[in-house]
Amino acid sequence: MSSLWQTVSENVVFVLEFLALIVVMFLIAYVIEKAVKKKNSDTERVLATRKIVVIGVFSAIAAILMVLEFPVPFAPSFYGLDFSELPALIGALAYGPVAGVMIEFCKILIKLVLKPSSTAFVGELANFSISCMLVLPASVIYLFKKSRKQAILGTVVGTLIMTAFGSCFNAIYLLPKFSELYGIPLDAIIGMGTAINPAIHSISGLVLMCVVPLNLLKGGLVSLITILVYKKLSPILKAAHKQ
């Protein structure tokens, strides 16, 4: 815990930027969910008390899945594959976009307790923001009409948005920020990609050949698993927040 506070104190400005992004994501999710619920004449509260209990359980599962990260052969070691978006996506489909963002946020907090940041919070920021780009569009599309077809459409759109956003965010902000915080030249980071794939010679090359396939793979697998299990879990989740 002391190492966590030390990391926070050493990167106060970055942590504040991270918190601002979290607030923005919550506001976007809340405004959209309230608007859709009003359109559908749905009077259920956005965050009922019983929902929060399930959200807590899903957040803990997501944090454990985030720690269990796997290396991928086509990307440097600071990129990894995890399935922490799975509980968030399932929770978002069941309870709405706000629940999905809350699971993503609580996941990061729990993960930092289980395993302190090794990237000065850059990795956690990347995971939260990029994951929300999958969870938010998918759950919003599903919220308009809750059907299997709509869920598939939502996860496909979410995966594409996550991939596009993740690519731009890495190139424009995350990789330069990682370089700045750790004092590692961008050329050295690009070199890590070149060591794996000789065709990588620039930030854009690193993003196109590492970040894009990683996000497509992650989004595709998480979406597929969600579609396969959600129908069976849905009655249980709905019953849980009505009890």
Model-based region annotation:
Residues 1-243:
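Loop-helix junctions at membrane interfaces
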